[in-house]
């Protein structure tokens, strides 16, 4: 129901204000949602508990029911902002198109698309201007370039570059955060335990410890640290 989406956005507004979140993109689907969140205070898990908990309470009260709305814990990834911010912004607003619910992001009201391309005042927690400024400092040109960028990416998948189920970034980014795991009590511990893995071996180590080429390929890929392209080029 549209009222339910409005309730979610109202709760999100309160959470962003309380936890100092910045939202770069969002899309509310019928049974899940996507948020691209920047957390200057490393408080993702606290904010997510508040967001899901308060929203669930409000929806259950409205519909006179009890229980959970979402199955399992949320999934989160640590993103290299320089490399993947725009890619994720595009991916998120295209969700309804990929799901074949609409033909264009402009037909789905419950994402940040309309704030990006329209003359609608954005909520204070939505980083509309900062995203548009990456395309042009002229707003009209920025909107045009942003729109073209989004529509050019309907068939593009970014998830082949996901490492360890947690990191979306290049090798340098992954190595940086892996090497700081013990110090990142505020960052990596924000992620569900099942998403955290011990650092993978090098491709050469997998090769040396495996009895066959196929086994080395399987173990390397299963580690989540390497894409098939990485393995093929080794």
Where are these regions (language model features)?
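Short Pro-Cys-Gly-centered "Cys-loop" motif that presents a nucleophilic cysteine in a tight turn
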Residues: 1-25, 29-30, 38-234
């Amino acid at each position: 129901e549209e009222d339910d989406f409005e309730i979610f956005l109202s709760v999100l507004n309160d959470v962003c204000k309380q936890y100092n979140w910045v939202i770069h993109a969002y899309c509310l689907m019928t049974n899940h949602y996507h948020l691209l969140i920047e957390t200057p205070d490393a408080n993702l898990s606290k904010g997510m508990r508040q967001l899901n908990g308060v929203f669930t309470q409000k929806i259950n009260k409205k519909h006179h029911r009890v229980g959970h709305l979402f199955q399992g814990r949320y999934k989160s990834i640590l993103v290299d902002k320089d490399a993947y911010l725009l890619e994720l912004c595009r991916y998120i607003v295209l969700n309804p198109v990929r799901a074949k619910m609409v033909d264009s992001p402009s037909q789905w009201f419950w994402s940040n698309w309309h704030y990006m391309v329209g003359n609608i005042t954005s909520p204070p927690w939505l980083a509309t201007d900062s995203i548009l400024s990456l395309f042009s400092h002229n707003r009209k040109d920025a909107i045009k370039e942003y729109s073209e960028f989004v529509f050019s990416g309907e068939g593009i998948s970014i998830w082949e570059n996901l490492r360890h189920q947690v990191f979306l970034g290049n090798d340098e980014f992954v190595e940086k955060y892996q090497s700081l795991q013990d110090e990142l009590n505020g960052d990596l511990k924000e992620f569900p335990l099942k998403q955290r893995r011990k650092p993978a071996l090098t491709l050469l180590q997998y090769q040396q410890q495996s009895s066959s080429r196929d086994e080395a390929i399987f173990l390397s890929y299963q580690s989540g640290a390497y894409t098939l392209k990485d393995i093929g080029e080794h």
